[in-house]
Amino acid sequence: MRRDERWDGVYSFEDSPFIMEILTELRDKNTDSIAFRKGLVKLGRYMGYELTKTMDVEEIEVETPLEKTRGILVKDRRNVVIITVLRAAIPLMEGLIKVFEHARVGIVSASRGKAPKFEIEMNYIKIPTVKPDDTVIVADPMIATGSTLIRVLKEVSKYGRPKRLIILGVLAAPEGISRIKEAFPEAEIFVAKVDRELNEKGYILPGLGDAGDRAFGAPLKSPR
């Protein structure tokens, strides 16, 4: 795990060869939907594992079949709320749940409009109550302009103030990170890698394309 010196509370996993290998497969335009979804699940699981290294632990006593000994309990792992941004984050959440099996789950359906306005449409929100000792993890593979996540974080803040507010993604653009940190300076951001920039259409470069379309197929246009 590597802290990005450009911002406070922003971390990447560029020093993990395994995570970088999965990311490389996701970037490949020839990776099919099945492999793409599996890759997102694996990233959710392994980045979730890395997140536990930042959580509070407690030393406890445990009794083996032979004698008593000391061990640890990752306390925060049992107080997690995962917010999934449909639809691209579904596989990412599946991986996170394998690490945070006690997590309560919230679902937000949000979509970003086209350039230049990038207006955000939200039509479904189900978020559990957030408690003061909770760690909220908002899962969204692509942190591009940051508009979607800022809107989601505003909704999450209505349900309570957590101990920690974490955004977990696969790729991020510097522009999106800066906007999020300006709006929510307390938010911690963990991504596999911070990419170079956004293009004029709001896509991350070099990126991996539209994560939702690549995981689940491009949606049909509404018939007229």
Swiss-Prot record:
Pathway of action: Pyrimidine metabolism; UMP biosynthesis via salvage pathway; UMP from uracil: step 1/1
Cofactor(s) for this UniProt protein: Mg(2+)
Activity modulation: Allosterically activated by GTP.
EC number: 2.4.2.9
Reaction catalysis annotation: UMP + diphosphate = 5-phospho-alpha-D-ribose 1-diphosphate + uracil
Protein family according to the UniProt entry: Belongs to the UPRTase family.
Protein's name in the database: Uracil phosphoribosyltransferase
Organism of origin: Thermococcus gammatolerans (strain DSM 15229 / JCM 11827 / EJ3)
Lineage: Archaea, Methanobacteriati, Methanobacteriota, Thermococci, Thermococcales
Gene: upp
